[in-house]
Design a protein with these regions (language model features):
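PLP-dependent aminotransferase-like
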Residues: 1-20
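ALDH superfamily catalytic-core signature
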Residues: 32, 38-174, 197, 236
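Short SAM/SAH-binding signature in class I
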Residues: 31-32, 211
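Structural motif
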Residues: 15-17, 36, 215
């Protein structure tokens, strides 16, 4: 509605498709390209744009961390993490990709996360008509393979017919496959740390994230994370509201 009110006919168009259609579009000589998506495809876009000397803006995703230290308000953190992560079933570029939490508060955090998932999405999210599905079968299959009996903490139910995967918490390490890609789904790995410096080192061992979130009552820890990590945007004691 906004587009139809704002622009004349012919000024805006939509092309639906996959690799073939995108490849064709990138062969055109545009004045400007704004791209939102994965780093891998962003590299392709930039290379093709360079052939026409077309300027670009690349808003690329990444593994956006959510740090929870021992001083955090755990119930508040859980409420806001569940909202930010599972909005649109995790299919947003600024969703918390994984949790890095102090090992001393992990059990309490998990307990609160489980409670919030039930409160926000019901005891059976797959049957909740307001809970979204995966965008397609390919993404459904990609998410489903990360869930195993060995790493499952909570959730894990999937429904192939509806392409729904319920909000899922996983025990994880940085060596796991789920930590090697941007998740873009309702899978939330949880990794622990001993101190904030270790958490910062782990974040900086990965590519720079699009977003970063920290839940902490310690100004020292907040400043350490914000000053020593590079990221696109983020929040203290909240998630995703920086894009509002």
């Amino acid at each position: 509605k906004l587009i139809s009110k704002t622009f004349d006919k012919g000024h805006v168009d939509t092309v639906l498709g996959g690799v073939e259609e995108c490849t064709f579009l990138l062969d055109q000589d545009f004045d400007y390209i704004f791209y939102t998506g994965s780093t891998r495809v962003g590299e392709i876009v930039m290379k093709k744009a360079a052939e026409h000397f077309t300027p670009v803006t690349l808003e690329m995703g990444g593994k956006s961390p959510c740090v929870v230290d021992e001083t955090a308000n755990i119930s508040l953190a859980a409420k806001r993490i569940v909202f930010g992560k599972f909005l649109n079933a995790g299919q947003t570029c600024v969703a918390p990709d994984y949790i890095l939490c102090d090992k001393k508060i992990k059990d309490k955090l998990v307990e609160e996360l489980e409670r919030q998932i039930v409160l926000q999405y019901s005891v059976d999210p797959i049957k909740n008509a307001a809970y979204p599905k995966m965008i397609n079968k390919k993404q459904f299959d990609a998410m489903s393979k990360f869930i195993t009996d060995e790493n499952l903490i909570f959730g894990g139910k999937i429904d192939e017919e509806s392409l729904k995967i319920e909000p899922t918490l996983l025990n994880s390490t940085f060596a796991d496959d789920v930590m090697k890609i941007e998740i873009f789904g309702p899978i939330l790995p949880i990794i622990t740390f001993d101190d904030i410096d270790e958490a910062i080192a782990k974040i900086n061992s990965l590519t720079k994230p699009l977003a970063l979130y920290i839940f902490s009552s310690s100004k020292t820890n907040q400043n350490k994370v914000l000053n020593r990590c590079q990221f696109g945007g983020g929040c203290i004691n909240d998630t995703i509201i920086h894009i509002a």
